[in-house]
Structure formats: C-alpha cells, structure tokens
Amino acid sequence: AGLVAGVTEAPEGAQFTRNVFSGKASAQVKGTTDKLVITTTPNAIGMPEGTGATAAVEAFNADLGDRKVEVLEAAQPSTEGRAPLPEAELVVSAGRGMKGPENWGIVEGLADAIGATTACSRPVSDIGWRPHHEHVGQTGIAIRPNLYIAIGISGAIQHLAGVNGSK
C-alpha cells in the first residue's frame, strides 16, 4: 500500500493536499497504488455528523505485582470552562512579546471577553510562563480555529505550521 502523510485536504478521488516546507507551501499529491494509507494533520478533516458509534466497555483488574512506582498526585490541566485547544473556534495566543508572565492577564482578559481559548508559542511554554498543553506550532498542537489572534508572537515558521489552518 502507498502512503500519503500529513494530509490537510482530501477531496474526492485519490488526490490530496499536504503541507510542505514547514507549512509555508502546500502540495497536491496523488496516490498511485490501489491501496492507500492516509494520515492527516490534527483537525484537518472534519467528521460528518452522526457517524459516531458506541463501544463496549469491559472492566478488568490488572495484577501489577510489586509496584516500583507510586503515584503521589494526578492532575489534569484546567481548561477553565474553555473549549479544548484542538477543538476551539476562537483562540487568543501570545508569545515572548508579552515580556513576562505577569502580563498574561491581558491575554486571559481578551479570551474571557470573546469566549476564546488561550494558547502560546513554544518559547513561552519552554520558559515556564504557560503550561505545555497550551503550546501551538509544529512541535505543539495544530489548530484550525475560525479566528486566531496572535499577540507578541514573531511568526516563526514552526509556529505558523501549527496554525496555518486558521480561517
């Protein structure tokens, strides 16, 4: 089987669109084998309504024997009532141009005012101003919101690769 990786659009037939050069350009590619394996970028292709199904849930007890690891605390990132980043329709994102974590209230205030989800650039998550689950870009979460507002972000191609599906 042939492989077409990173598909961003899949019209009818065996022709596909995929990003190249870290999202700076797109290429039209065509599958040339009878069988194709296709991978998509996150949220690139919407799900038709009503195609979901239920799955059976089966409980079981795992025998872990002598545990060498002890879980002290488990926590999920708080989304503060906002849509999960990969599904968000409105996103307000910021970068190092905010000059410090003490200025992040501006981003939160704007996001709250318009009902958006917050995001950040990789440098912001790397230096610890924001949690890594808010990092959008080539090495973070790829998003496709209807509106993407970037504040203090330089626009590096790695960042743009994760937000180029924004409308």
Predicted regions: what is each one?
Residues 1-167:
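N-terminal glycine-rich FAD/FM-binding segment characteristic of electron-transfer flavoproteins
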